[in-house]
Amino acid sequence: MSVDLKQQLELADYLGALAVWCIFFGVLFILSVIFNFVCIKKDDDVTALERWGYKKNIDMKLGPHRRSMVARQIPQTVVADH
């Protein structure tokens, strides 16, 4: 009498790990945006999430600061023509 311990995995088994990964990072993103609005005050520095959104030209507010305020606090890179 022998017992076969070899598992037979299907596609749905592999997609479970992908679903957990997507849910985890989705919740992490939502929590970081909520913390940006709740814990960061208007007189604080611009957050990394706001800088990223400004550089990628995303048309949504990712923190408590206005777009003009974010633009003033980001160092502008000047490309010199040779």
From Swiss-Prot:
Pfam families: Nlp36. It comes from the Eukaryota. Keywords: Cleavage on pair of basic residues, Signal. This is Neuropeptide-like peptide 36.
